[in-house]
Amino acid sequence: SSKVMNVYVDGELRDFALVDVALSKERFVASRAIWDMETVFEVFLTRAEPASIGLSSIGARLEEVSLADEGGLQYCIADAEAPTPEDRLVLAPIAPGVIPSVAISSWRRMPDGERISIEKRYCTVALDGERSFAVTDAQQLELEVRRDGPPIIDVNLTLKVAANQGLFNLSPGN
């Protein structure tokens, strides 16, 4: 099985992501606003691979985590208004043609199966950049990386096998 990042609100499973969960200071995030590094303050990843594009590419500049590796990665975006010498500045492609420098205040590996509690605050939780929901400062948000996600298909291998078996050959008699 692949990895998933489960998101719990007040102890109940609310949703999950296959790659990334981003927390934004905004109370509502339009579909493209999650790429605004001035609003994102914390990111949780199931994987962080150097060739990726998106929030996971930032994580890959800190520590590489593949699908085969145990656990995930958590990082915090530094406060742009109050940078510190300890912040780590990385250059990463977060969207095609968008390669900002991003200051990271901290990061750590996340072990499989350990729920991490987030400080209560108003924020928007964005999942894989596809869907989002808001939480209030009265709700407890927790995240956990697990290895019980959906099966993964190797697309390149699948297409290679199909081509070798002639499945794309439309000539008569095949």
Predicted regions and their residues:
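Catalytic core of DAGKc-family lipid kinases
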Residues: 1-69
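Glycine-rich, charged/polar anion/phosphate-binding loops
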Residues: 3-8, 31, 35-37, 75-77, ...
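Short hydrophobic-aromatic micro-motifs
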Residues: 15-24, 53, 75, 90-91, ...
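Active-site beta-loop-alpha substructure in enzyme catalytic cores
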Residues: 52-96
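ATP/nucleoside-binding phosphotransfer catalytic cores, i.e., glycine-rich phosphate-binding loops
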Residues: 81-174
